[in-house]
C-alpha cells in the first residue's frame, strides 16, 4: 500500500512538472457538459447542444488549435451521420468554430446530422519556448490533427451522439486536400509514429465519405499539370523569355507523369498524354450541358459548339428527362455521361464540341494565372517563397523546395524529410495501396473557371478513385471559381442517398 501511495505521489508530481513545461489535456468527453445553442437558418432556428474545446490528443502542443467543437441538433441519435468540417485554407492554421448558415454546417444541423468542426495547426502556427518561436504547424501537422480528431470521435462513439462509422469529411482548397487525405489515408501505418507521440486515441482513423471542393493536392506534380494545361494560353505567351522557358520545361514533364498513372476512362480506354485533353473537354462539356439543361446560357464565344438547329443556346432542359423520375442506375449514368444509355441525341439539344484553346484563354482572362512555377517557387527565401514552400518548411520557419525541378534550379535536392512529408500530404500516392483504408464514397468538385490548380489535379483524384472501385460523384462545376460548400441541396441529396 505504501509503495502504491509513493508511486501515485510521484505520478502526480511528474504530471505537475510536465504541465508547467507544456500545456496538456486529458482525452475525455463529458456528456453532461453540453451547452444549449442555436443557429438561424432561412427556414427557421435550429437548436443544438454544443460540446466545445474537446482536445483530441493528450500531448497538446498548441491550445489555440488542437481541439474541436461538436454540435448535436435536437433529435440526433447514435445513428446520426457526423459531418466533420475543416476550415483549413492555404495550409494555414484553422480554429475550431461555430456552425454557420453560409457553409455545410448549418444545413447539416438542420437536417439532423451531428457536426464536428475541427481546429488544426497550420504553416504559420507556432509555440514559444523561452524567447524562441517553434513553428510546429508545418507538414504534416494539419492532417495529423484531423486524423487525431477522427480517432477521438471513434474512441467516444458510445458516449457521444452520432455514428463514428458514418463520418463524412468536408473541406475547400487546402481544406479540400485535407478532406481528400482523411478519405484516402485511413489507417495508413506511416502516420502512426506521429499520432502516438501526440497522444491520439488508439483507434482507426478511416472515414465513410469525403467531400472535397477544389482540393489543392498532388503538389509534387501540380506545377507540371498547370503549365501543361495553361502553357499555350495568350497569358503565358506574353510572359518574358525566362518564364516562358520555365513553363515549357514544366509542361514537358507532365506527359510522362500522366502516362505512368495508368488511369482509365469509364469505358476502359487508357488515359495518356495523347487523349487527356480530350478527357478534360468531355468533362467540361458534361458540366456545361448540365448547366444548360437547368436554364443557364452558355455562349459560343468561349469555345462551345452547338448542333446547327440549336443556334447559340440550347433549349432549357434540352429535352432531358427528370432525374428524379428515372431508375436510380439510369439517373446515375445520366449525371455522369450526359444522357442515359440507349437515348440518342435529339436535334437542337446538345453541345457538340469545345475549342479548348479558346476556353482555356477564357479561364485565364477571368482570373490571372499564377506565375510559373505555380506552387514550388524557384526562389524559396523571403517573399519569393510560395505558401506551399512554407508548408514544407522547418521549425525555424525556413521554407523548402519540394519538387526535383525547382530544387534543381536552385542547385539543391529535395530532402528526405520533405519527401516523407510530401507522401503524407498526397492522397494520390496512397489510394489503392495495401494496408490503407480508403473511404467508399466521394463527392469532388472543381470549378470550371477555377485556375488555382489545374483541372487534372481533381480529375486524376476522381479517376483513380473510380478505377479502384470507389463511388465517386465528380463535376467540374459550371462557372464556379475557387470556392466551396455550394449547391448544398444537391450535396445533401447525395449524403442522404449514401447514408440511408
Located regions from the model:
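Hydrophobic h-region of N-terminal signal peptides that target proteins for export
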Residues: 10-18
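C-terminal catalytic histidine-bearing segment of alpha/beta-hydrolase fold enzymes
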Residues: 222-226, 263-338, 343, 443-450, ...
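Primarily recognizes the serine-hydrolase "nucleophile elbow" in alpha/beta-hydrolase
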Residues: 155-232, 422
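N-terminal cap/lid segment of alpha/beta-hydrolase-fold proteins
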Residues: 23-78, 412-424, 433, 464
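Short beta-strand element of the alpha/beta-hydrolase
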Residues: 68, 78-91
